[in-house]
Structure formats: C-alpha cells, structure tokens
C-alpha cells in the first residue's frame, strides 16, 4: 500500500497552551484552533464514556526550502475533558518500553532552539552532542517538554539536509522512536504485518553515544549497554517513519497498558494511504489485528476521511487514513 510521510503525531496533553506556546514562539510552528473532535473519533480512540469533549489544536511547522507548506509532519494537540488521566510513559526513562518514546525533527541550529526551550522549562535526556551512527553524522538532543512530550531535535551533518530554515526553526516530524523489549516481534509487526520497508538495522556496542547524552544512560553503562536498532518506512514514503530501539543490558518498566487515550503523552502517529479500507483488509489478511476498524469521519482540517488504526505489540498506536 502506497503511503505518504508522517502526516501528524497526535499528542494528548493536560494543558494545550502550555505545550503549544514554546513550540510556536521558539520552534516556528503555526497554530490552527480546530473544532472539537467528532463522536466517531471518541470510538476510534476507545475514549471512556465519561469524556465530555476532545479539544484540538493543530501545530504545523513553518515551511522552508527543504519542506514545502503541505501540512505534513504536524503536531495535533488534544485535550480530553472530564476524565481521569495519567502520563503514559510516566518516568520518561529511555530504557523503559512501551508506546511511542519520541518524535524526531531536523533543525539547522539545534543549540539555539534547545536553549530557548529551556527558558520555557524544558529539559533533556542530556546535553546536545555530536556522534556518528551507521551512515549518519549528527548533533542531537532529546528534549523533554511537559505532559510526557519528548522531542528529538537533530542537526544532521552527513548526509546534509539542504534548505532548512537557517535560524533553526524545526522541520516537519519525519520519524518516531519506539523503545521495545521484544525486538523481533516489533520487527515482524512493521516488516510483515504492516509491510513497511526496512531501511536499516544495526547493533550499537562499545560506544558512548548515542547513549550518555542522547538517551541519558549513566556511564560506564552508556558504553557497555548493547542496543539493537531498526528503521522502517512505509511503502512509497520518501522519509523514514518508525525507529525501533532495544536495550539488551538495561531494563526498566513496561508502559504498554498506559499508552492509550485519554492518558497524556504521544498518543499515535497518522499516515495517509491510497485506500485505508483496502489496507486494513490487507493487514487482517496477514494475521494482523485492528485497534479501530475503518470508519468514515471528519478530521479537521483534512476533511472527510476513512480511518483505521493498529496497535504494535508494545502499545504504539498507528493510524492510517485515506481521503
């Protein structure tokens, strides 16, 4: 099934304004206040019946020469009213598993952006740091905002990303990381059940980064901890979509059960496909289980869509829609 790059990451929050303001003022996002989500979205997200409304705001990255103004790679901030909530990945440790760990963006001036975010109360797993991994040479910081939101900001030296805003304004979301305990099951899910394309796989051993500052692993364990990594992209998409990481030597808590609505954190990723109903049937034909069956609903500002979702073996919700 032909799929476009990440359309948006849906982020559940306690307070929309608290997360939106620094993303707008520092990172260059443009906001659109949306109508509340319709009743069909409540059902698709398995929202408890006591929820009275789903408030929404869309944050779209500023266009650049590298990334035109097509609305992709956006952040949809949602607030569930009238229900009890907790943070999905509560302690934010990079060796905990379950759900969606972060979303990834490019910046031409990572340090400027991160230092400005710190003035809004943001922190990070560690300091911005240069490192090389596989064919990539980058500078990176994994920034931590409010409400369980983790944002990996990447300044890529090689291969260089041409046409980014020179002041550091963030690119669209192009990738998202999931920390898993069963690497083989996650690889089968994305590679076989969803038929995503495996872009690369590698093992990380006997290096400090990405570990000490990127993931907050304490020394000497940052060097000693063996990690497996795989990057998948949907068929037809020009950019990567899902990065899987397993830490073989450091083990934390599993947060799978908490990574659902109306809890707070990165709720799901959304991808546009040619034919959502047909893709759902393909997934079921390969033995996959749907989290939400295809439904027709209005998703502002996209319009009337057919949408369904799946849930990975460790609780990451992935939505697919077609216009």
In which residue ranges do the predicted regions lie?
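Amphipathic alpha-helical segments
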Residues: 15-30, 116-119, 182-198
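Eukaryotic phosphotyrosine signaling hubs
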Residues: 6, 98-102, 174, 264-267
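Low-complexity, glycine/alanine/valine/leucine- and proline-rich hydrophobic stretches
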Residues: 249, 262-271
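Active-site/binding-pocket entry motifs
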Residues: 65, 83-84, 238, 250-251
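Vicinal oxygen chelate
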Residues: 1-2, 8-11, 32-36, 57, ...
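Long, charged/polar, surface-exposed segments that mediate recognition or autoinhibition
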Residues: 89-96, 262
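Hydrophobic, helix-prone linear segments
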Residues: 1-82
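Short, flexible, glycine-rich and Lys/Arg-enriched loop motifs at helix boundaries
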Residues: 37-52, 85, 204-223, 252, ...
């Amino acid at each position: 099934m032909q799929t476009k790059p990440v359309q948006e990451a849906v982020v559940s929050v306690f307070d929309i304004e608290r997360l939106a303001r620094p993303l707008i003022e520092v990172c260059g996002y443009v906001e659109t206040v949306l109508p509340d989500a319709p009743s069909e979205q409540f059902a698709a997200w398995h929202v408890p019946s006591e929820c009275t409304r789903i408030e929404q705001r869309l944050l779209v990255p500023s266009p650049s020469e590298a990334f035109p103004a097509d609305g992709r790679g956006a952040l949809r901030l949602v607030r569930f009213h009238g229900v009890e909530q907790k943070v999905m990945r509560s302690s934010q440790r990079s060796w905990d598993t379950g759900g969606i760990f972060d979303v990834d963006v490019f910046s031409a001036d990572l340090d400027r952006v991160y230092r400005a975010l710190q003035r809004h109360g943001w922190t990070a797993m560690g300091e911005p740091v240069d490192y090389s991994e596989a064919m990539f040479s980058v500078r990176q910081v994994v920034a931590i905002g409010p409400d369980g939101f983790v944002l990996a900001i990447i300044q890529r030296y090689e291969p260089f990303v041409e046409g980014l805003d020179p002041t550091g304004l963030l690119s669209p979301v192009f990738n998202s990381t999931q920390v898993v305990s069963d690497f083989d099951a996650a690889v089968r899910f994305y590679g076989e059940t969803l038929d995503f394309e495996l872009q690369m796989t590698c093992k990380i051993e006997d290096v400090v980064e990405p570990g000490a500052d990127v993931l907050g692993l304490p020394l000497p364990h940052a060097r000693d901890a063996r990690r497996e990594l795989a990057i998948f992209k949907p068929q037809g998409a020009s950019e990567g979509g899902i990065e899987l990481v397993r830490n073989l030597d450091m083990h934390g808590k599993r947060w799978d059960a908490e990574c659902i609505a109306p809890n707070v954190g990165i709720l799901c990723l959304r991808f546009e496909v040619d034919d959502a109903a047909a893709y759902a049937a393909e997934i079921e034909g390969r033995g996959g289980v749907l989290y939400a069956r295809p439904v027709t609903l209005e998703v502002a500002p996209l319009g009337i869509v057919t949408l369904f979702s799946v849930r990975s073996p460790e609780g990451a919700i992935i939505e697919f829609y077609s216009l």
